[in-house]
Regions:
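Short, surface-exposed connector motifs at secondary-structure boundaries
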Residues: 61-63, 136-137
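Acidic ATP/Mg2+-coordinating residue in the GHKL
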Residues: 69-72
Length: 137
């Protein structure tokens, strides 16, 4: 089943507007928080991802960032890592369709579980959550 959001997505109100940036950053430091961003490689050439990166850069209280990336090759993964280099928190670029991940997911087929796709942002989020949970408390 395919789901289309349309032109305007719902952004839930988490009362972030009630916080100033300093208080929000301090609160992040008190509660371990990992942010997960599913990405396609072509999004790195668009202004939105640069804005997201630049907005996250001052958040020293963020525990980590997981980028669930669909990329064609290892050079693209390295470019994504370079794009997020210098952040004040650990950044893990997870190559969702890389050879090691494909091999692992295909091996689960022996258990009669099909977890190989279909590829897309939902599939990337599913994988990224697994990566983010590795360091969860």
């Amino acid at each position: 089943m395919d789901f289309q959001q349309g032109l305007i997505s719902t952004v839930h109100d988490y009362s972030l507007g009630n916080h100033n940036a300093i208080a929000f950053n301090q609160e992040l430091g008190q509660r371990p928080t990992t942010l997960l961003i599913p990405c396609l490689m072509e999004e790195f050439s668009r202004p939105a991802l640069t804005l997201i990166r630049d907005t996250l850069a001052p958040l020293t209280g963020l525990s980590s960032l997981v980028i669930a990336l669909a990329a064609e090759n290892a050079e693209d993964v390295a470019a994504a890592e370079a794009f997020f280099a210098g952040m004040p928190f650990p950044v893990h670029v997870h190559w969702t369709n890389g050879p090691a991940v494909r091999e692992l997911l295909e091996s689960v087929g022996n258990l009669d579980l099909d977890v190989t796709g279909p590829p897309g942002k939902g599939w990337a989020v599913w994988q990224g959550l697994g990566v983010a949970c590795q360091d969860a408390e």
